[in-house]
């Protein structure tokens, strides 16, 4: 039989549970997202002379826990995942100088973080640029849609982060053969359909359908030419439309040489005409002058029967 005392204890415990859940929920709601725009050492306490725990890189995902003053400067206590790339990682807490921290409430915070992403991306492209700058740019761009989902820069930040991740994966694929993860590019397409960023993401995804090597056979360039042509026709307003048409035309030019080497003149002539037609679409439909000039060059080579596939190809169909 349940006594009144027992009922009271149960009600008291239930009230405690509800209160705890409310406190946790309130803390989660108040926890402020933040990131760094320069690398800093995480300290065990506020102050320049405190013990250093770990180096925190640009663009790391942070949660503000507390604020304080030390050495006449503002400091923030933060929580962060030790491994920023892992889905599950040990959390570490410590103190950072507040001057390098940008939060979701920082005025123009989205532009500041995005701008540091652009700077890091440029560093990655420069000879002798900062080590790890590409990963910095990836993290910084990722923070923009996470911290400022309503920002005009959110879609572009998501796309640039996904593209950098993809380019790094391509380098790793060439070295190790590790498959490239499509998830982040597909998120761009899902969250910003019909946008410029979605069209660029769709173009990147074509990489996973290309052959690692042609081995002088017609199958791969035939398939790849069709892929690029289909993309150009499905995404006529894409910034990559002209490039896609050129890639389709160039592969037809390569097929012209492959079939000629195999003494299949009818297929060689058909590929030549197809290549010319695709290149002419660039001249008539696209505005990018660089791709127009490249199309003109390719048409000239096709009309003059100048080989484009392999520098050692000669007109007899033999190799030097």
Task: Locate the predicted segments by residue.
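Short coil/turn linking the two alpha-helices of tandem helical-hairpin repeats
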Residues: 83, 117-131, 162-174, 206-218, ...
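Short solvent-exposed coil/turn linkers within tandem alpha-helical repeat scaffolds
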Residues: 47-49, 85, 144-156, 171, ...
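Helix-turn-helix repeat elements of alpha-solenoid scaffolds
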Residues: 129-142, 174-184, 217-227, 268-274
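Bacterial N-terminal signal peptides
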Residues: 11-23
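SH3/SH3-like beta-barrel superfamily modules
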Residues: 53-96
């Amino acid at each position: 039989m349940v006594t009144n005392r027992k009922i009271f204890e149960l009600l008291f415990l239930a009230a405690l549970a509800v209160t705890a859940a409310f406190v946790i929920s309130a803390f989660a709601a108040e926890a402020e997202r933040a990131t760094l725009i320069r690398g800093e050492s995480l300290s065990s306490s506020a102050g320049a002379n405190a013990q250093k725990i770990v180096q925190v890189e640009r663009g790391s995902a942070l949660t503000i826990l507390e604020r304080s003053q030390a050495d006449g400067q503002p400091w923030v206590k933060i929580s962060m995942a030790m491994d920023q790339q892992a889905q599950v990682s040990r959390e570490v807490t410590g103190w950072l100088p507040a001057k390098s921290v940008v939060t979701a409430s920082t005025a123009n915070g989205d532009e500041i973080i995005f701008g540091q992403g652009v700077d890091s991306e440029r560093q990655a492209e420069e000879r002798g640029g900062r080590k790890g700058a590409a990963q910095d740019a990836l993290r910084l761009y990722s923070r923009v849609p996470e911290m400022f989902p309503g920002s005009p820069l959110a879609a572009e930040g998501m796309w640039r982060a996904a593209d950098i991740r993809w380019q790094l994966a391509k380098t790793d694929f060439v070295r190790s053969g590790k498959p490239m993860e499509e998830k982040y590019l597909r998120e761009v397409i899902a969250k910003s359909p019909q946008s410029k960023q979605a069209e660029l993401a769709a173009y990147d995804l074509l990489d996973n359908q290309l052959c690692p090597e042609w081995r002088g056979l017609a199958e791969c360039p035939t398939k790849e030419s069709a892929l690029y042509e289909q993309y150009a026709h499905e995404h006529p307003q894409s910034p990559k439309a002209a490039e896609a048409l050129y890639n389709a035309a160039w592969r037809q030019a390569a097929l012209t040489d492959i079939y000629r080497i195999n003494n299949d003149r009818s297929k060689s002539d058909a590929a030549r005409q197809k290549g010319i037609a695709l290149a002419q679409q660039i001249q008539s439909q696209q505005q990018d002058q660089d791709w127009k000039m490249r199309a003109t060059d390719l048409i000239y080579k096709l009309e003059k029967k100048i080989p484009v596939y392999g520098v050692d190809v000669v007109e007899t169909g033999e190799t030097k």
